[in-house]
Amino acid sequence: MRKTRLWGLLWMLFVSELRAATKLTEEKYELKEGQTLDVKCDYTLEKFASSQKAWQIIRDGEMPKTLACTERPSKNSHPVQVGRIILEDYHDHGLLRVRMVNLQVEDSGLYQCVIYQPPKEPHMLFDRIRLVVTKGFSGTPGSNENSTQNVYKIPPTTTKALCPLYTSPRTVTQAPPKSTADVSTPDSEINLTNVTDIIRVPVFNIVILLAGGFLSKSLVFSVLFAVTLRSFVP
């Protein structure tokens, strides 16, 4: 029983280290209302130059939602505008530029640049973007100093989403309890109620442990027997 608990503890530590190593990194942007988010996502030029790229938002307990995507095949430096989102794909530099103009508080959230390749899973580019938009100060001379609400005027080349709705073929299970609801917080709890059913210790290891214990007990018994025997010898 004690060995099972020890193996369970070691397994828990291993899983925790594995989760920490594979945790997706995030880059945080803190902006005010009316400002512009400007993100540049690098990609492998030889592999993804003409691939369709997309800008997605990730909400807790839901699959990523595509907000805008480039044409297919993606055209070099051709701006695509969907609402307040502008995408520009620079093939020469292997760079996707994403701008969200006239930011609002409700735009706060977690975003990502991806290679959009249905029915395959999207391939994520760059780090995920944690956007935090706060209220600006109105009525002051510098309130609109950094605002780019009316700066980017793109010709009406593309004003609708070009990517069809795509649902991942994976089965989406119900969102886990609150401890795993926040995307930015890694899981720290592991259910080990059925550890005995999950962890199977190799038989060879058990034999080695039992043999070692048996030999240790035999050695102690032999020493005690020798000491006792000498005490009775005149």
From Swiss-Prot:
GO molecular function: receptor decoy activity; scaffold protein binding; signaling receptor activity; transmembrane signaling receptor activity
Leader sequence segment: 1-20
Residue ranges, Extracellular side: 21-205
Keywords: Adaptive immunity, Cell membrane, Disulfide bond, Glycoprotein, Immunity, Immunoglobulin domain, Innate immunity, Membrane, Receptor, Secreted, Signal, Transmembrane, Transmembrane helix
Cytoplasmic side stretches: 227-234
Entry keyword annotation includes Glycoprotein: yes
S-S bridge residues: C41-C113
Annotated GO biological process: adaptive immune response; humoral immune response; immune response; innate immune response; intracellular signal transduction; neutrophil chemotaxis; neutrophil-mediated killing of gram-negative bacterium
Keyword Transmembrane: yes
Pfam families in the record: V-set
Domain of life, per lineage: Eukaryota
InterPro entries in alphabetical order: Ig-like_dom_sf (IPR036179), Ig-like_fold (IPR013783), Ig_sub (IPR003599), Ig_V-set (IPR013106)
GO cellular component terms given for this protein: cell surface; extracellular region; extracellular space; plasma membrane
Induction remarks: Up-regulated by bacteria, fungi and bacterial lipopolysaccharides (LPS).
Designated name of the protein: Triggering receptor expressed on myeloid cells 1
Organism: Homo sapiens
Name of the gene this protein is made from: TREM1
